[in-house]
């Protein structure tokens, strides 16, 4: 079965439809994997979320930071940012059905031998460990304690993974790695201040995927999140955030043969240091 991995949508529903038309013209009913940030900043977050909900028999998603932010805003833990475009979801008659489905999605998944995440994987983690740690977060997010989990989710510390981490600190570190990571120090300490392109790392930092002895180096990691990185294709990496909401492109890559399909996107937001 053919599978396409698709980059950050961020509420760009029109471009999603155009991309799916191109995919279906080549491989009708191909399996789909979306690497998170389904909603927010684009003009049609509700339509995008509803469309993926309708595709759930052929599509899988991992949660991104904007998707988690939607859940936090919806339950009153966070105020919307001035650039957020979530009002249509918050006012929708089917919001609870959509949000319940959303919080039952994983932060990491395996598809055809690929590890799919939104942002990155810490160098200390193997593919199986990343999936297991994602499962810890998923268990809480899908439980009756999900609001309390979201309340403790925000923050940049602990910035370095330790197997002995417990409670909210442990879950926060997992979430930050899988949904926010770009740069790390050589010892695996996460940096959340820098969002620039990977070829210009600050002193003492490297893109997470260039760290030596990364335990997922023998697997192919598929991710999004890093729009200034653009399309990245290496034997063991697929970076798919090509800046759709910023006036770039929406990208799909066939996981079997790496055929690439793209659609151009109008600029809905101006890039900032925290996109």
Swiss-Prot record:
InterPro entries: ApaH, Calcineurin-like_PHP_ApaH, Metallo-depent_PP-like. It comes from the Bacteria. Transmembrane segments: none annotated. The keyword Hydrolase applies. The keyword Hydrolase applies. Gene3D superfamilies: 3.60.21.10. Keywords: Hydrolase. Disulfide bonds: none annotated. Its EC number is 3.6.1.41. It is an enzyme of class 3 (hydrolase). One of its GO terms (molecular function) is bis(5'-nucleosyl)-tetraphosphatase (symmetrical) activity. It catalyses: P(1),P(4)-bis(5'-adenosyl) tetraphosphate + H2O = 2 ADP + 2 H(+). Coiled coil: none annotated. CDD domains: MPP_ApaH (cd07422). PANTHER family: CYTOCHROME C5 (PTHR40942:SF4), PTHR40942. Belongs to the Ap4A hydrolase family. Hydrolyzes diadenosine 5',5'''-P1,P4-tetraphosphate to yield ADP. This is Bis(5'-nucleosyl)-tetraphosphatase, symmetrical. It comes from Herminiimonas arsenicoxydans. The gene is apaH.
């Amino acid at each position: 079965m053919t599978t396409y991995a698709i980059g950050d949508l961020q509420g760009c529903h029109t471009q999603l439809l155009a991309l799916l038309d191109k995919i279906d013209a080549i491989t009708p009913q191909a399996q789909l994997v979306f690497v998170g940030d389904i909603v927010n900043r684009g003009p049609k977050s509700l339509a995008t979320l509803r469309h993926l909900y309708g595709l759930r028999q052929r599509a899988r998603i991992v949660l991104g930071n904007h998707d988690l932010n939607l859940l936090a805003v919806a339950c009153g833990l966070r105020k919307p940012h001035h650039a957020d475009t979530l009002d249509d979801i918050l006012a929708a008659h089917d919001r609870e059905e959509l949000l319940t489905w959303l919080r039952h999605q994983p932060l990491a998944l395996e598809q055809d031998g690929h590890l799919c995440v939104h942002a990155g994987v810490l160098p200390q983690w193997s593919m199986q460990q990343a999936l297991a740690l994602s499962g810890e977060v998923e268990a809480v997010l899908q439980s009756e304690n999900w609001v309390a989990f979201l309340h403790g989710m925000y923050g940049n510390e602990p910035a370095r993974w330790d197997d002995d981490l417990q409670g909210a600190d442990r879950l926060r570190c997992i979430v930050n790695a899988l949904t926010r990571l770009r740069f790390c120090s050589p010892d695996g300490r996460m940096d959340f201040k820098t969002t620039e392109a990977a070829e210009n790392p600050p002193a003492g930092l490297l893109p997470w995927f260039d760290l030596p002895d990364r335990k997922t180096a023998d697997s192919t990691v598929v991710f999004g999140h890093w729009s200034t990185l653009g399309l990245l294709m290496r034997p063991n990496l697929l970076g798919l955030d090509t800046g759709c909401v910023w006036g770039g492109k929406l990208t799909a890559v066939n996981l079997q043969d790496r055929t690439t399909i793209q659609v151009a996107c109008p600029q809905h937001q101006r890039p900032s240091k925290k996109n």
